[in-house]
Amino acid sequence: MADQIAISVLGAGSYGSALAISLARNGHPTLLWGHDPAHVAELEHDRCNKAFLPDVPFPADLQLTADLQRAVQAAPVLLLVVPSHVFGQVLSQVKPFLRPDTRIAWATKGLEPDSGRLLQDVARDVLGETIPLAVISGPTFAKELAAGLPTAISVASTHDDFADELSHLLHCGRSFRVYTNPDFVGLQLGGAVKNVIAIGAGLSDGLGFGANARTALITRGLVEMQRLGAALGADAKTFMGMAGLGDLVLTCTDNQSRNRRFGLALGAGKAVETAMAEIGQVVEGYRNTKEVHLLAARCGVEMPICEQIFQVLYQGKNPKEAAIALLSRDKRDE
């Protein structure tokens, strides 16, 4: 495998910028694409992402562009870091410019809006069956990754050699450890469900329920994640790894998590719209909650925590009433 592999990162938000910074530091020719020319011009002028990562300058050789055709054709590996609700749209825009050797990965954590389908199914609908696909997932906050603090993630792919290639691209012995995992479905699912549970953890803390309640919610949330995974053929061990337990604990316990902060605001009595506006960035868990609800219903899987969060967000249920509904469920074996 060549030491250097060109890669284009599609999505110049906080996480896309952090991944591009890490890849460029690793010595790989890296191009960061953003959809808004004015924003990209600002990034180029400042040579940092002032909005999200103001203390981390871009490496000198990190290139930027708002030209999607240039980004797609500049590298054989594309890494999508875009919100889940525009994932299919971006793939459709990318498709006309694909190279014969293109491989596509994503760091997006979520499901298809209005259907709850896995992003792999969206990608196959748009791109067909031949292009190698991969997903990276795990406990990563953009600020810490960009700052070079120790971080570990997992990568899964439809093609083992592509998983190995991404591991080579991302892995940095000083700070960034990358595990490969054969469970393509499990890695996608873990990233979506943990966003929902993180909102629940924030709600619990916002209501003042304390550490006992938060820990119980995380633990039973993991059970719901495993239950849905089993229905979709995922490996239960995946949910005890980086993309499951790791990401779940991170986003449920640290206030860098937008989903947790969103839940905290709701628990403090703020309306959904107000809480979203205060975050000021995409809260993936809001949409993920509806998507997981749809997927669980389609699979016939019981997910009581996710269901109560859905009712709070989309049906106006009082958060305290949702907590009571969970605690008053019939007794059962663990």
UniProtKB/Swiss-Prot annotation:
Annotated keywords: Cytoplasm, Lipid biosynthesis, Lipid metabolism, NAD, NADP, Nucleotide-binding, Oxidoreductase, Phospholipid biosynthesis, Phospholipid metabolism
Top-level class of the enzyme under EC nomenclature: oxidoreductase
Residues that bind sn-glycerol 3-phosphate: K109, G138, T140, K194, D247, S257, R258, N259
Binding-site list for NADPH: S14, Y15, H35, K109, A142, R258, V282, E284
Reactions this protein catalyses: sn-glycerol 3-phosphate + NAD(+) = dihydroxyacetone phosphate + NADH + H(+); sn-glycerol 3-phosphate + NADP(+) = dihydroxyacetone phosphate + NADPH + H(+)
GO MF, one example: glycerol-3-phosphate dehydrogenase [NAD(P)+] activity
Any single GO CC term annotated in Swiss-Prot or TrEMBL for this entry: cytosol
Keyword NADP among UniProt keywords: yes
Compartments in which it is found: Cytoplasm
Involved pathway(s): Membrane lipid metabolism; glycerophospholipid metabolism
Active site location: K194 (proton acceptor)
Any one Gene Ontology BP term: carbohydrate metabolic process
Pfam family, one: NAD_Gly3P_dh_C
Keyword Lipid metabolism belongs to the record: yes
InterPro entries: 6-PGluconate_DH-like_C_sf, 6PGD_dom2, G3P_DH_NAD-dep, G3P_DH_NAD-dep_C, G3P_DH_NAD-dep_N, NAD(P)-bd_dom_sf
EC nos: 1.1.1.94
Similarity field: Belongs to the NAD-dependent glycerol-3-phosphate dehydrogenase family.
Functional description taken from the UniProt entry: Catalyzes the reduction of the glycolytic intermediate dihydroxyacetone phosphate (DHAP) to sn-glycerol 3-phosphate (G3P), the key precursor for phospholipid synthesis.
Protein's name in the database: Glycerol-3-phosphate dehydrogenase [NAD(P)+]
Organism per entry: Aeromonas salmonicida (strain A449)
Lineage, uppermost ranks: Bacteria, Pseudomonadati, Pseudomonadota, Gammaproteobacteria, Aeromonadales
